[in-house]
């Protein structure tokens, strides 16, 4: 057989067509595939990708469903919950759509800024969302961060926490959520760019810019500072959702000065910070206000979604104590139930706990420490005694350190 005839015998190993029947025949080790079969394979793969996108999008909770889940754990803050639900849904929808072959429109990432007083639920909102979506979650405190080369934590260490939360599964970590608290503490020390180095303020903002937008970062696997002889973990932050939280103490003055709240001028009533409704005032915040506060323009541009949280009042704190799925009252009742003891909180006691949290300016975050101090002596005593039927926490036991909750013995209740 001539070489020409041998060439004519070459055929696609999949469809059986000869070389002269197709535009191109691609050769592999003892196998051939034609351009038509390549196109067909590509179509099949794309169909499968579209199916997985549909499955992913179907399993992703809709904004209303996310809101319902948040309602189980977070009391109040309706506007913030709605804004978060929409932003998070759009973020993960964007990730799944990237699997598609469509390149016509690129949806940009929308990081989120939660602006609200201490103890208003910023951290809890972020944690609950991560748990709902079953994605890795990492928390960091902006106050510990410094610019690379200075004493403190590098921003890459935040990414290491996320990788650790994903059990070092990089692909999983790249779809995670990072919450950075106290972001207001890295504000520039003055509104104007400084000649001297601001390593814990503007320097940190500059260092965070790349990972907020999306970059392939080199992360030291053991944490700490980078050195040239160590191996690095590479993580792409393009699809990592960053939620930033801060109390932004003093921002209300900037908003008022701009005229965002009509409390200035002749005849205006001067209100103290406690009298001001910070939640409503913060709703009027503009990028220029954050700029004056000390957040650099590039940083503001990378956090397009802004959600404000309200200051929690006495009634809201009482609800937080009792209503969420993991409410503090339910937790302490469960703890005593394990010792076969019933626990009751009088309404006056709950209100007294809420008042103490407001006085301490700790919001919901301070509730646990107050309840813990009230219950300490009782919880020390109860496990050692088998004749206790019930414990009643009264208003007096909350307000007076020398008064403990009432202990009801089993024989006392029977005689009553």
From Swiss-Prot:
MF terms in GO: ATP binding; ATP hydrolysis activity; ATP-dependent protein folding chaperone; protein dimerization activity; unfolded protein binding; zinc ion binding
Pfam families: AAA_2 (PF07724), ClpB_D2-small (PF10431), zf-C4_ClpX (PF06689)
Top-level taxon in the UniProt lineage: Bacteria
One annotated Gene Ontology cellular component of this protein: HslUV protease complex
Binding site for ATP: 117-124
UniProt xrefs under InterPro entries: AAA+_ATPase, ATP-dep_Clp_protease_ClpX, ATPase_AAA_core, Clp_ATPase_C, Clp_protease_ATP-bd_su_ClpX, ClpX_bact, P-loop_NTPase, Znf_CppX_C4
Domain ClpX-type ZB, first and last residues per copy: 1-53
Gene Ontology annotations of biological process type: cell division; proteolysis involved in protein catabolic process
Presence of the UniProt keyword Electron transport in the record: no
CDD domains tied to this protein: RecA-like_ClpX
HAMAP family documented for this protein: ClpX
Family to which this protein belongs: Belongs to the ClpX chaperone family.
Task performed by this protein: ATP-dependent specificity component of the Clp protease. It directs the protease to specific substrates. Can perform chaperone functions in the absence of ClpP.
Subunit structure: Component of the ClpX-ClpP complex. Forms a hexameric ring that, in the presence of ATP, binds to fourteen ClpP subunits assembled into a disk-like structure with a central cavity, resembling the structure of eukaryotic proteasomes.
Protein name as it appears in the record: ATP-dependent Clp protease ATP-binding subunit ClpX
Organism the protein comes from: Clostridioides difficile (strain 630) (Peptoclostridium difficile)
């Amino acid at each position: 057989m001539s070489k020409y005839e041998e060439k004519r015998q070459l055929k696609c190993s999949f469809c059986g067509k000869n070389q002269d029947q197709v535009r191109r025949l691609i050769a592999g080790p003892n196998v051939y595939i034609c351009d038509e079969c390549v196109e067909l394979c590509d179509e099949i793969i794309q169909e499968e990708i579209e199916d997985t996108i549909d499955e992913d999008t179907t399993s992703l909770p809709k904004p209303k469903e996310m809101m319902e889940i948040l309602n189980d754990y977070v009391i109040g803050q309706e506007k913030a919950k709605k804004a978060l639900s929409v932003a998070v849904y759009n973020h993960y929808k964007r990730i799944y759509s990237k699997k598609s072959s469509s390149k016509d429109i690129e949806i940009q990432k929308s990081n989120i800024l939660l602006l609200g007083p201490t103890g208003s639920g910023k951290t809890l909102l972020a944690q609950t969302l991560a748990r709902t979506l079953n994605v890795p979650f990492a928390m960091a405190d902006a106050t510990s961060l410094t610019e690379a080369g200075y004493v403190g934590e590098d921003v890459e260490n935040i990414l290491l926490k996320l990788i650790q939360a994903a059990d070092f599964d990089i692909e999983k970590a790249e779809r995670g959520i990072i919450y950075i608290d106290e972001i207001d503490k890295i504000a520039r020390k003055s509104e104007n760019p400084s000649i001297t180095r601001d390593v814990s303020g503007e320097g940190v903002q500059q260092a965070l810019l790349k990972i907020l937008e999306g970059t392939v970062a080199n992360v030291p696997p053991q944490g700490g500072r980078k050195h040239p002889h160590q191996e690095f973990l590479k993580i792409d932050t393009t699809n990592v959702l960053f939620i930033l939280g801060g109390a932004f103490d003093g921002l209300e003055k900037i908003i008022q000065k701009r005229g965002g709240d009509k409390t200035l001028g002749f005849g205006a009533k001067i209100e103290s910070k406690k009298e001001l409704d910070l939640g409503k005032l913060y709703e009027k915040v503009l990028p220029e206000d954050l700029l004056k506060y000390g957040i650099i323009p590039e940083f503001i541009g990378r956090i397009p979604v802004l959600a404000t949280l309200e200051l929690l009042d006495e009634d809201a704190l009482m609800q937080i104590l009792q209503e969420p799925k993991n409410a503090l009252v339910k937790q302490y009742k469960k703890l005593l139930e394990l010792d076969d003891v019933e626990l009751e909180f009088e309404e006056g006691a709950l209100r007294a706990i809420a008042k103490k949290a407001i006085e301490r300016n700790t919001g919901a975050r301070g509730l646990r420490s107050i309840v813990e101090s009230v219950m300490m002596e009782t919880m020390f005593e109860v496990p050692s005694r088998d004749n206790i039927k019930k414990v009643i926490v009264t208003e007096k036991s909350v307000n007076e350190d020398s008064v403990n909750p009432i202990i009801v013995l089993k024989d006392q209740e029977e005689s009553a």
